Amino acid sequence: MSGFNFGGTGAPAGGFTFGTAKTATTTPATGFSFSASGTGTGGFNFGTPSQPAATTPSTSLFSLATQTSTTQTPGFNFGTTPASGGTGFSLGISTPKLSLSSTAATPATANTGSFGLGSSTLTNAISGASTSSQGTAPTGFVFGSSTTSAPSTGTTGFSFTSGSASQPGASGFNIGSVGSLAQPTALSGSPFTPATLATTTAGATQPAAATPTAATTSAGSTLFASIAAAPASSSTTVLSLSAPATTAATPTAGTLGFSLKAPGAAPGASTTSTTTTTTTTTTTASTSSSTTTTGFALSLKPLVPAGPSSVAATALPASSTAVGTTTGPAMTYAQLESLINKWSLELEDQERHFLQQATQVNAWDRTLIENGEKITSLHREVEKVKLDQKRLDQELDFILSQQKELEDLLSPLEESVKEQSGTIYLQHADEEREKTYKLAENIDAQLKRMAQDLKDIIEHLNMAGGPADTSDPLQQICKILNAHMDSLQWVDQSSALLQRRVEEASRVCESRRKEQERSLRIAFD
């Protein structure tokens, strides 16, 4: 049937159905279905399913009904799928997640394919029909979280799922929240895959928890996906948008890619995110392994269903992530030592400069202190001078007052003398006395002038007798003239001595001549 059906049929419907179907073995239908059928119908299902006997999986895209068989539910599902795997756009929530209808717990479901926004425990989205418990290659765009225990292989595509099983070698774009469960399912699909990564996914994510389980790495980018650890997994290459929640205990390999992780972290886990050109190393808590991750993390929250649903028992808390942290290459000891030496030299230079400035400031301080003391002493001296000046002013005032009193006393005496001057006659003795007094005054003035002249002569002689300046040409001429004078005086003295000797010799000769003449006269007589 391929149309709009508002009645109830037992056959697979391929359109919009709002009736209630009876239990019958049907085949998968394609289209939009709003009825409740016992089989995996394709389309929108809003009905309540009856308990069918045995059905086959539907392969349609949108399914909003509640299916009770172990077949897959394809499409939009607004009911609760107890135990079935859908391959459509799933907005329903499986057993442990959000529930829009009240149903009992169901066994493990298969993978949901296509575009899933539900939060199943672990459902691998398959574009086609899948009836077995083993997960097949998912092909689609899934925002749901799937729970399955089937082993999964390398997946490729864009994944927004949240699973608990680990798929080895999944490559694509993962935005789901990945949990942990036993035995990964082999997934191999197209660009949008419900890859449920069980360990540290690509991007710069390296979660670590206290539970020692085997951890793997994934190369790619994880956004919005919570990744949990699985017992055995391998490297997955996806563009994952999930937040890792693995509990890695064994040594893990380096991851490379682009990741945006949720800050919900395990108690002892730490996630380091770096750019694609930087390599960092994070160590796990209570483990002995480290993982070098290279990628870019934007730290977004994982997709957690809102509603009265129970969280999967196998899921662990997500690990915290450090956002946008960029670390460069590690510094070597030689570089560190060179930096320390450089800083030491700079510190010594600054210390010497500081000591020089401190010495100069100390000298200035001493100078200021000395000048302050000098100013203080000068101020004291000025105060003393002010006191002396005040005392001198007082004495001068006293002298002025005394002089004024003396003038007051002399003025009447002078007046009386003037009055009596006309009547007094001077005697001869008084006149002589007056002349003698005037003569004494003249002699005293002359003596004073002579004393002043003598002082001038003495000063002139002292200046002349002092050491003469040899550079003065006048002094040199004076020396030459003095030498000539000395020579002339010596010649004069020598000539005077010779004159005396000549006179003596002439007297002796004269005396002998006279004696000879006397002797001759006596002889002739």
Swiss-Prot record:
Biased composition, class Low complexity, residue ranges: 269-293
Region entry Disordered, spans: 260-293
Keywords: Acetylation, Coiled coil, Cytoplasm, Cytoskeleton, Disulfide bond, Glycoprotein, mRNA transport, Nuclear pore complex, Nucleus, Phosphoprotein, Protein transport, Repeat, Translocation, Transport
Processing and modification events after translation: The inner channel of the NPC has a different redox environment from the cytoplasm and allows the formation of interchain disulfide bonds between some nucleoporins, the significant increase of these linkages upon oxidative stress reduces the permeability of the NPC.
Highest rank taxon of the organism: Eukaryota
This protein's record includes keyword Nuclease: no
Modified residue annotations for Phosphoserine: 411, 421
Any single GO CC term annotated in Swiss-Prot or TrEMBL for this entry: nuclear membrane
Required for centrosome localization as annotated region, ranges: 331-461
Mapped Sequence repeat ranges: 6-7, 46-47, 78-79, 115-116, 143-144
Compartments (UniProt record): Nucleus, Nuclear pore complex; Cytoplasm, Cytoskeleton, Spindle pole; Nucleus envelope; Cytoplasm, Cytoskeleton, Microtubule organizing center, Centrosome
Modification type N-acetylserine: residues: 2
Domain topic, free-text comment: Contains FG repeats.
Oligomer and partners: Component of the p62 complex, a complex at least composed of NUP62, NUP54, and NUP58. Interacts with NUP88. Interacts with NUTF2. Interacts with HIKESHI. Interacts with OSBPL8. Interacts with CAPG. Interacts with SAS6 and TUBG1 at the centrosome. Interacts with MCM3AP.
Protein name as catalogued: Nuclear pore glycoprotein p62
Species for this entry: Rattus norvegicus
Phylogenetic classification of the source organism: Eukaryota, Metazoa, Chordata, Craniata, Vertebrata
